[in-house]
Amino acid sequence: MEIYYHGTSKKFPAFDMAHALEGDGKIKMGAGFYLTTGYKRAAHYSCKSPGSTDFYVYTVEIPDLTPENHIEFKEPVNPIIIRHAEEKLGEPIPLEETTDGKFFRKYIAMKLAGKTGNKKLTPEDEMAAADFLISIGVIYNKVPFIWTKPVVHYDVIVMKPDVMRILKIEQVELAPPRKNAKPELVEGSQREIPLDSLK
């Protein structure tokens, strides 16, 4: 099992895909819940929802990432995943679309939506792609955010929320951002929210 953090302005007892777009509504790296290895990064994410005044960081446990259950930004897609996707689509996937997890995800989304060229994907298209990937055993999308080798700091987009277990919820305070900067966690402001109070 692996431990990550999730920032949000909402309190809830379990993750539900119906609420996956309640942050800023953007899907930059695919549909799902965005977890991160960095606590401070999660705290920053907690203020993404417009008009939010309360901020929370969730400590979350998920099953280990394996070569067969995740795709990764700027990394080739595992051959087993490619084979399962081709079997389900009923046709081969162009080699260039398998050289990067991002290309692969977008190709699947475009194919399912019947779109070509530079047509923009909708949140619904991305959700359909997530459902497709889940059906072939892919439940994570890994995206590094600090590129120093070896890469140890990254975000994980979880497409299948029922694998996520909330271990702890903490309400946090954020300092007003300096000019051209992001809001920052106020160290020591964390206040744990009892999980049984949300049931």
Predicted regions and their residues:
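Active-site and NAD+-binding cores of ADP-ribose-processing enzymes
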Residues: 1-29, 46-199
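Glycine-rich phosphate-binding loop of ATP-grasp-fold ATP-dependent ligases
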Residues: 31-33
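Extracellular glycan-interaction surfaces
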Residues: 36-44
